[in-house]
Amino acid sequence: MPLRIKLTHRGPLIGSPELRFNAGLLFGGTIPKLHNDDVEFSFGWGGAATGDTSLAFLKTMAVAKDVNEFMSTMETMTAEKGYRGMAANIIMADNSGNIAYQQAVPMFRRKDETPYLGCRVLDGRTSEFDWTDEIVPLTELPRAINPEKGFISNANNRQAPDNASKDYGATQMSTGRSVRIDEMIRQGIDSGKKFTADDMIAI
């Protein structure tokens, strides 16, 4: 039996009770009447943008000589059309001891620079909240080079402060897990521990 999918300029329509229920779990507090049978949602996803460059970025990661080269190459590659690839939290290190983090995600700007740049349900009856064709540059996304604390960890958690000018997404809810990872690493550092691969697996 063929599956009929309705498409809009924003993306496919989500109309099934199951999909609406799952959307309600994530976005239920943001709009009224989420479970109304007459409501359909168009689902926009930056990862569906044309011109995926994921493989090119993976190659860049593999051949970069150091952290600075990798970061500058990424900026150059995305200067014109923005980052168009799989969403990723990229953590890197080089032989000189430099470390860095870059959030890489195809995040489109909205008209009038509204703060709703992440996963939010908005009124689709108007084009007011539509994306523009511009992707937010990597330099405006969360990043760090040689942070003062001396290490970088990530557990798909929120990387931006609460007063950040942009909404970086509703799905990065693992902050508690990340805090615990940081605690365990700090405890090891304070005790003079030399971490091994097995230690990282245990954490």
Where does each model-flagged region fall?
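Mature extracytoplasmic enzyme cores
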Residues: 1-203
